[in-house]
Design a protein with these regions (language model features):
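Non-catalytic accessory segments of hydrolases
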Residues: 1-131
C-alpha cells in the first residue's frame, strides 16, 4: 500500500503493474440534504489515513444500457470523487490529464474500466485524473 498526502488529508492507494492507483477521493462535501441542487462546497477533510482503494458511486442517472451496462454500477448522490493514476509520488513535475467522461449529462461515470488511466500513466509518465 502507498500513502499520499493531499490537502484534505492522507490517502492510501495501491500499486498495480508499476502504477500507483488512488480511487474514490472526495473533492467536495457530499451534495446531500441541504446541499442538494446547490453549488459544491469544500470537503472538511480527514485526519486519519483514508483508504482510496475502491471507486465511489456514480451520480444517479437513468439506466440506459449501452456501454455502461457491461459494468455493475452503484449510484448515490454522494458521488463527487476523483480517481488518480500516477507512475510515482516524487518531486517530478508531470503533465496531468484530467479526464471528464461523456454521457450528454444523462449517463456516464469515471469508474468504468475503459477509462482506467494506468496505461497512460505508466507509458506516458503522466498523472491521470478522472472524476464522477
Amino acid at each position: 500500500m502507498t500513502i499520499a498526502q493531499t490537502t484534505h488529508g492522507p490517502v492510501e492507494g495501491r500499486e498495480k503493474e508499476g502504477v500507483l492507483l488512488f480511487s474514490g477521493i472526495p473533492y467536495a462535501a457530499p451534495p446531500t440534504g441541504p446541499r442538494r441542487f446547490r453549488a459544491p462546497e469544500p470537503h472538511d477533510g480527514w485526519k486519519q489515513t483514508r483508504q482510496a482503494l475502491k471507486f465511489y458511486p456514480a451520480a444517479p442517472q437513468y439506466p440506459t444500457g449501452g456501454m455502461t451496462a457491461a459494468v455493475p454500477v452503484r449510484w448515490d448522490e454522494d458521488c463527487l470523487a476523483l480517481n488518480i493514476a500516477t507512475p510515482a509520488i516524487d518531486d517530478a513535475r508531470r503533465p496531468v490529464l484530467f479526464w471528464i467522461h461523456g454521457g450528454a449529462y444523462r449517463t456516464g461515470q469515471g469508474n468504468v474500466p475503459w477509462y482506467n488511466g494506468a496505461q497512460f500513466a505508466r507509458n506516458g509518465d503522466i498523472v491521470v485524473v478522472s472524476i464522477n
